[in-house]
Regions:
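A short helix-coil junction within the Rossmann-fold of NAD(P)-dependent oxidoreductases
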Residues: 1-5
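Catalytic tyrosine of NAD(P)H-dependent dehydrogenase/reductases that use a Tyr as the general acid/base
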Residues: 26, 34
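Short beta-loop-alpha junction of Rossmann-like oxidoreductase domains
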Residues: 22, 55-68, 121
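Alpha-helical segment proximal to the catalytic Tyr-Lys
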Residues: 42-45
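Active-site helix of classical SDR
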Residues: 29
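Active-site loop immediately N-terminal to the catalytic Tyr-X3-Lys motif
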Residues: 18-24, 81
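C-terminal helical subdomain
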Residues: 53-54, 73-118
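Residue(s) in the substrate-gating loop at a strand-loop-helix junction
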Residues: 13
């Protein structure tokens, strides 16, 4: 195809790295996105296609609303979790999209700073 080139930005999740209790279907699909991102990155090289993945944690959407109200933790406790403004994710996507095709951010994690990610459980 002419012209060639482009950029794909996949939507991952911190849950692929540190799952929540009872989240096997969601976690496994987000883990699969990592394999997809790596495969597209490799196969896309000859077509000048760059592929990135953003692993998102606790961005303020309808899906995450329950986290600020309290969600089950690995310990079995229900705890409220911090939420970040989803506009920060949009800015990160924009910044990746603006890169020249000879430059790539392969993987990025963006999350509420104090969410239980490091040391989850």
């Amino acid at each position: 195809q002419q012209p060639q080139g482009g950029r794909i930005i996949n939507n991952g999740s911190v849950s692929a790295h540190v799952p929540r209790p009872g989240s096997a279907p969601y976690t496994s699909t987000k883990h699969a996105i990592t394999g997809l991102t790596r495969s597209i990155s490799l196969d896309g090289r000859k077509f000048n296609i760059a592929c990135s993945q953003i692993d998102i944690g606790n961005a303020g959407t309808e899906m995450t609303k329950r986290m600020s109200e309290g969600i089950i933790q690995a310990s079995g406790d229900i705890k409220k979790e911090p939420i970040m403004d989803v506009s920060h994710v949009a800015k990160a996507v924009y910044d990746i999209a603006e890169l020249p095709l000879n430059t790539n951010i392969q993987f990025m994690t963006i999350m509420a700073s104090s969410m239980p990610y490091i040391g989850r459980g």
